[in-house]
Amino acid sequence: MDAKQKIEILSTITLTEEQLNRIQSLDDRIKVEVHKNKEPNKIPDEVWRKTEILLTSGPNLPAVEKVPNLRWIQSSWTGVDKMLDDPLLQQKNVQITNSSGANVSQMGEYVIMTLLMLGHKMPQMIQAQREKRWIEDRISSLQPKELRGSTVGIVGYGSIGREVARQLFAYGATVLASKREVMHPKDTGYTPESLGDPNGNYFHRLYPIEALKGMLEECDFVVLTLPHTKSTECLFDKEMFDNMKPGSYFVNVSRGQLVDDGALIDALNSGRLAGAALDVFTEEPLPSESPLWSQPNLIITPHISAFSPNMLDQVIDLFIENLKRYLLDRPLYNVVNVELGY
């Protein structure tokens, strides 16, 4: 990298003055330009021509011919599946990094919250409160499923799954995890200090994805944190739910496309699942006519688990760590394998 050449960064994310200063103070060569308009054709061509680094929430990207100097795209989201088919990402000299790890703290808390709510029958008690109804058989019907002594299965042991495992450790739960490469239990992606499980210390057993059905049979709770790819589309179908332990609970914070909604509803109605929590859906916003809304043992939230007042600062922390690496010609954190989809 030329020690004198300007490094032109374009952000389509609105930055605070403090965030802007943090980025620009890294190196005298850095120049940041902020355009709030996320539509590529509304950003001047001369800006695109000189852009070397793009900080964006996407999903729309500029045409290949507009960005001859672009070398790196930093997405503010963990999931970049909506960008993967863009011709720009087929260029060998352009790499994209996601924000995996940046928002794990709040997502871990969300998962723990839903596990506790489900296990302690909170949906049933909230419904009774709305009806002003005292639950007379409370001792028998509201027996909790405690996390302590329970087995929790985490499907997808990336940054989110690892933070869930770390938080579960304090509750005394047995953690089973499933990932694609079980021979590499360590996490080489971005991990904020004191969070996650970078060294693979918080799971009790690790399963390859091919052995997922066997893992599910042992789990009182199952948490889905896999990325959406062609191979994970509708992963949780009738056959997969039928392999789950009777009376278990299911939480999805990944993508709605990984779950067959009809199969989930059948599992809830049959008692195979005692309850579930969904933060993501195949269609968002979730249509009012969706039968999911009517399930009494289902918690629905509007794709909110990653959000926090600190969310953008967390993304900028990651971007700065990656920018330091970029300046030193070191490998970046969270480089997305376009062929794999994550």
State the predicted function of each range.
Residues 12, 57, 76, 225-228, ...:
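Short, well-ordered coil/turn residues at beta-beta hairpins
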Residues 49-130, 144-145:
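Phosphate/diphosphate ligand-binding glycine-rich loop within oxidoreductases
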